[in-house]
Amino acid sequence: AYHDALMLKEEGNLTKGEREMIVTTTSAANQCLYCVVAHGALLRIYEKKPLVADQVAVNYRKATDITPRQRAMLDFAMKVCERSHEINDDDFAPLHAHGFDDEDIWDIAAITAFFGLSNRIASFSGMQPNPEFYLMGRVPKEKKPA
């Protein structure tokens, strides 16, 4: 239920693609293969960019398929992921400058924290991505004959 409240939420200024971008980027930092592959597939589909998931999983700071707004979002998500004890009021100004409101900032942090837990459960339980996840959103779907 909490997953759906975070990831399928219609309100706010985060797109479904941006939500998946947060999951993919922070899951890579947490070395969770399952979540990087599964959520990377959703990211490619939502953003309609076949390279974006690989770019943010390897190094979002050098990704060419994200906007400055998304980079600021990921900077904050990574700080929540790796150094949440260092977060202070100065971390919110860049997000506000890119049009995020306080609820969006809460969502960025909550998605990061929720999937930090999920990453650890997936890793210790040995979850592996389904093979079809690797191709989803990379190759155009074949059109069925009419």
Residue ranges of each PLM-predicted region?
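Hydrophobic alpha-helical segments
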Residues: 1-146
